[in-house]
Design a protein with these regions (language model features):
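C-terminal recognition in membrane/secretory proteostasis and scaffolding
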Residues: 13-18, 54, 69-72, 192, ...
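Collagen/collagen-like triple-helix sequence repeat recognition
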Residues: 23-86
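A conserved glycine-rich beta-strand in the N-terminal activation segment of trypsin-fold
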Residues: 87-94, 113-144, 174-176, 232, ...
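Terminal peptide-recognition signature
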Residues: 104-106, 129, 141, 145, ...
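Active-site loop architecture of trypsin-fold serine endopeptidases
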Residues: 112-113, 118, 122-123, 147-162, ...
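Short glycine/Trp-rich loop-beta-loop segment that forms part of the substrate-binding cleft
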Residues: 166-168, 208-230
Length: 420
């Protein structure tokens, strides 16, 4: 059942940092199950021996045999790959420090609408943002934040978007930015800044995650909680994808459905628009909401990176206007199955079927076609979930061509559609 949530207005907050929870059963996991009580770093140190003596007496084969005797079930080469690739870090400081270099405080000033001759009262609200793209030669950058951070229904501007927005990097001064464009439906806004700061070596653009996130994955949140400055917190991904109902930003009397990830981090005003990162420092989402039920704690939400990047790219390519292409199909999920992937992570597989065809897809696609893949701008994405189809289409503009691979009457067919 979809549940009503409330988006974060005003000062937005810093969220969660976490450590990666692996989906595989590692040699260290086996050791713990068999009574080992130390940390992974202490376990690794025990394998190396003390003062260079004990460890030198052990061979990798002996270590493998010991692991097998204690329940390890993989072959020697898998063990060798795991053992040699183990990286221990006492904390997530490396990822946090990198992510902090792409984080921004976002501050907006507004004047209240006034129906008299005098200008309305001035007020402000704060949030967070991330550097989406940077041009060192030009000293410019695109910044992503939430639309609700830069928008206020009480504003006296025609668009209700602030016309006085600044960003502040970690340890840096405020930089004026211009509003490029945004989408209230997807709660994404794009800002552009030009300043010598962006020609320096300190600022970094975010790295986007490649692929889907998993339950239990670490989530490092960098933001501006309560307007107190950039900081980091930690949590995990509780649900990798779900639909929630939120109040329409531009129309408080209506509601919109949006796809989000659920995280267990405590979210407070000030972190909206801030980045959610994995343990590798890759952007996995943008924090935007929390539960409106005051009796519920540690239930917050983030817009997935696949939506964030698609909407931002659309806005940038289309000169500030979000205008996605329309394929002309209605899709539904007819079957859902849980399974384990190659890393023993729990996943969901959905059978995505076309239920209605209209517009651009008329005469090309058919009802009951099972969608297998979509190719956009030369990139083919296998459709195992409904959002594998819907998210990439957000990147397209009217006139763009997409190829949809479907299964029809036992045959696989590639169908190219020009978006309307």
């Amino acid at each position: 059942m979809k549940k009503k949530k409330i988006i974060l207005f005003g000062v937005i907050l810093a969220i969660s940092i976490t450590f990666m929870v692996g989906c595989t059963t590692s040699a260290y996991d086996i050791a713990v199950k068999n009574g080992y009580e130390g940390t992974e770093s202490e376990w690794l140190a025990s394998l190396n021996g003390t003062d260079g003596s004990d460890g030198s007496d052990l061979t990798i084969t002996q270590i493998y045999n010991e692991a097998v005797q204690n329940g390890y079930e993989r072959n020697f080469f898998e063990f060798l790959d795991e053992y040699l690739s183990l990286e221990y870090s006492p904390d997530s400081s490396e990822a946090i420090n990198r992510c902090m270099r792409s984080a921004m405080i976002v501050q907006c000033k507004f004047n209240k609408r006034s129906y008299g001759l005098t200008r309305g009262e001035e007020y402000g609200q704060q949030g967070s943002g991330v550097i989406y793209a940077i041009n060192k030669e030009q000293g410019s950058a695109y910044i992503i934040t939430n639309y609700h951070v830069v928008y206020s229904s009480d504003s006296d501007t025609q668009t209700r978007v602030s016309n006085e927005i600044t960003i502040s990097p970690y340890g840096g001064s405020a930089i004026s930015v211009t509003y490029v464009g945004g989408s209230a439906q997807y709660d994404i806004a794009v800002l552009k800044a030009t300043d010598d700061y962006f020609s320096s070596t300190f600022p970094l653009a975010i790295n986007l995650v490649n692929g889907d996130v998993t339950i239990g994955q670490s989530a490092i949140a960098i933001g501006n909680p309560a307007g107190e400055g950039l900081s980091a917190t930690q949590g995990i991904i509780s649900v990798e994808s779900e639909e929630i109902i939120m109040e329409d930003i531009e129309n408080s009397s209506s509601y919109v459905s949006t796809r989000v990830m659920r995280i267990d981090a405590a979210v407070n005003s000030g972190n909206s628009g801030g980045g959610l990162f994995n343990s590798a420092g890759e952007l996995i989402g943008i924090v935007n909401a929390k539960s409106s039920d005051t009796s519920i704690e540690n239930m917050a939400y983030a817009i997935p990176a696949s939506i964030v990047s698609a909407v931002a790219d659309n806005i940038i390519k289309n000169n500030g206007n979000f205008n996605k292409g329309t394929v002309g199909i209605t899709i539904t999920v007819t079957q859902t199955t849980g399974y384990l992937d190659e890393n023993d992570c729990v996943r969901i597989a959905e059978t995505v079927v076309i239920s209605q065809v209209s517009g651009a897809a008329s005469g090309l696609l058919q009802a009951n076609d099972v969608v297998k893949a979509i190719t956009i701008y030369g990139q083919t994405i296998t459709v195992n979930r409904m959002f594998h189809l819907t998210d990439p289409i957000l990147r397209t503009l009217p006139g763009d061509s997409v190829t949809i691979t479907v299964e029809r009457s036992g045959q696989t067919i590639d169908v190219t559609v020009v978006c309307s």
